Amino acid sequence: MSDSPVIALAKDLMSRNSVTPEDAGCQDVMIARLEKLDFVIETMVFDDTTNLWARRGTQAPLFVFAGHTDVVPAGSLEQWHTPPFEPTIIDGYLHGRGAADMKGSLACMIVSIERFLAEHPDHTGSIALLITSDEEGPFINGTTRVIDTLEARNEKIDMCIVGEPSSTHAVGDVVKNGRRGSITGDLTVKGIQGHVAYPHLADNPVHKALPALAELAATTWDNGNTYFPATSFQIANLASGTGASNVIPGEFDVQFNFRFSTELTDGEIKRRVHSILDAHGLNYDLKWTLSGHPFLTDEGTLVEAVVAAVEDVNHTKPALLTTGGTSDGRFIARTGAQVVELGPVNATIHKVNECVKAADLEKLTDMYQKVLEKSLV
C-alpha cells in the first residue's frame, strides 16, 4: 500500500541527514511544494545556517507555521532498530530521526496548507512558513535572525503555530501556549590555593561558597501563577581542585540555571543572586547567559482556534501548559505575535529509535488545516 501524502513527505524529509546546522536539502523539498502554491520564496543564509521565509499574500492577518529542519545526532547506530535516516513504518509507527522533532510536523504543515488552499483559495489574510536549520544548535543564526530581518522591514506576524512536539500521551492532548524563560549563571568563586595541612595559609572557596549555594537553592523565587509553575533554580555543574587530595583549591566554578515565570524578570533574578552572594562576602566573578524570556499567549484568536481544532479532531479539549524547555517560539513572541506550540507526542524525541504514530501525523494535519480555517476563513 502506498504512503499517504503526509507520510510520503515526512519520509522524504527524514531521509536527509540534516544534523544541526545542516539542512541537507530539506528546505528545497518544501520550496518545491510551496512554489506550486504561489508562495514567494526567500532563503536567508547566515553563516552556517539556512533559513526559509515563504509567504503567500500581502494582507493581514499573517498566519505563520514555524519549525526546523535540523535534527540532533543519531548517536550509537548499533542501538537503533532501523537506520536513523532510513524512515520505516513498523506496527503503525514511523521510525527515524526527526519523526517527532520535527520533520513529521513539517510534512503536516505543507499538506495542511495544500488542502486548505484547495478548498479556500480566496481566504483572508496571508500564510507564511519560517523554517530554520539552527534550532537544535546554538540558535544564533536561525529564527532570531529571520525575525530581526522581518522586523527591520516592518513585516508583522499576527499568529504563529510552532510545530514542536508538544503532546504527551496522544497528539493534541497538550498545547503549549507559553514557555518559561531560561537564564544561566557561570560563577567563579575565588580563594587562595594552599596545602590542606596549612588551612590558615589558604582560603578555601568551596567552604565559603557552599552556604551561599544552599541559600540560593532554598530560596522561594516566586510562587508562579495561573499559567506558570514557580521559578526553578538548579545547580548544573560544579568544578574545583587539582585532583590531588592534599591541595586546597584556589577557585570554585559553579554553573546554575533558572527556569523562570512571568512573575520575575531576568534583571530581578540577577539582582537577588548578587545580593545573596555579596551577603556571604564572596570574592567572585559571575557571567550571565539569557537564553530566552518567558512568554504567554493566554487569549485571542489563535488559542481559541487551536483549542477548537484539537477538540474537533480528538473530541476532547487540550490542556494549555507552559512546561518544558525553551523553543524558537520565544523569538517570535517578542514581536507581540500570538504563539502556540502544537505537535506530535514527545516521548521519543532526542532518543535512539525516535518514532511517532503514523496516524498521529494524519490527525495533526487535520488539526493544522482546521486552525487555518478558523483563523483565515
UniProtKB/Swiss-Prot annotation:
GO molecular function terms noted in the UniProt entry: acetylornithine deacetylase activity; cobalt ion binding; succinyl-diaminopimelate desuccinylase activity; zinc ion binding
Binding site for Zn(2+) 1: H68, D101, E164
Cofactor names: Zn(2+); Co(2+)
A Pfam family annotated for this UniProt entry: M20_dimer
PROSITE patterns, per database record: ARGE_DAPE_CPG2_2
Record SUPFAM superfamilies: Bacterial exopeptidase dimerisation domain, Zn-dependent exopeptidases
CDD domains: M20_DapE_proteobac
UniProt-recorded name of the protein: Succinyl-diaminopimelate desuccinylase
Species in which this protein is naturally found: Photobacterium profundum (strain SS9)
Lineage per the UniProt record: Bacteria, Pseudomonadati, Pseudomonadota, Gammaproteobacteria, Vibrionales
Underlying gene: dapE
